[in-house]
Amino acid sequence: MLLDVAVSPDDRYVLTADRDEKIRVSWATAPHNIESFCLGHTEFVSRILVAPGHPELLLSSSGDRTLRLWEYRSGRQLHCCHLTSLQEPAEPWGDKRFAVSRITYWRQEDCVALLCDSLPVVYLFQLDAPRQQLVYRQQLPFQHRVWDVAFEEGQGLWVLQDCREEPLVLCRPVGGQWQGVPESAVVRRVSAHLRGNWAALEGCAGGDSGLSGLYKATCDNMTSYLKRKEERLQQQLERKRRRTCPPGPAGRPRR
């Protein structure tokens, strides 16, 4: 089951993200020929993105709550960030399973933004290409569930959230930290358009992403097995007791 697709900038390779924990790199002219596999995720691979400006590097995310950096032609993993290690203990979703539903990239500063399914937060990283690693920068918290995020060159990070009164937030780096900027004429105009089509937007963007149903099923068979075993033993003991206690004169078991 394919969950995402990317094409290398030179159009030589097709990259596919799989529910079965792997990323496959195939030749575009002959997709049955596999160049490499990127292996390491322990859950479904939700999103992949070839880093703009760095055609040899691939970003991937997964239901295992990691962001990974690859040299995809060789299938070599360069770096892995565990998102759970970035969470504060007091955050209400600290123990919740989540997957990244969007990866977006700002080429101007090699900035990576991650949107996690159902969480009111956006994670920000910086790609250090010379050192082949991802550097965590900050979290952007929001009061409402975030539906989508996208960078616009020359503008900043657009954040679409589940709030009819304030559906759109524009964030920019200020003093080295990203933050929401005062509402501009552009934000007001686009927000007014979104409010006018809120029912359609809510039905589309506000729906379930479907990622929650992709996790591997884990069954605690031991508990049910032991219960059934105990029931069988009790039944066997009952049958044995009945066989060893023949009925008395009145048809009742002897005591």
What would you call each of these model-derived segments?
Residues M1-A28:
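Fungal eukaryote-biased detector of long internal structured cores
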Residues A6-D11, L49-E56, T104-E109, F151-G154:
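Loop/turn segments within WD40 beta-propeller blades
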Residues V14, L57-L58, V112-A113:
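Acidic/hydrophobic-patterned starts of short beta strands in beta-sheet-rich repeat architectures
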Residues A17-D20, S61-D64, C116-S118, D162-C163:
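Conserved strand-to-loop turn within each blade of WD40 beta-propeller repeats
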Residues I23-W27, L67-W70, Y123-Q126, V169-R172:
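WD40-repeat beta-propellers
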Residues A28-P31, Y72-G75, D128-P130:
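Short loop/turn segments that connect beta-strands within beta-propeller blades
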Residues Q77-R255:
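Terminal intrinsically disordered, low-complexity extensions flanking WD-repeat/beta-propeller proteins
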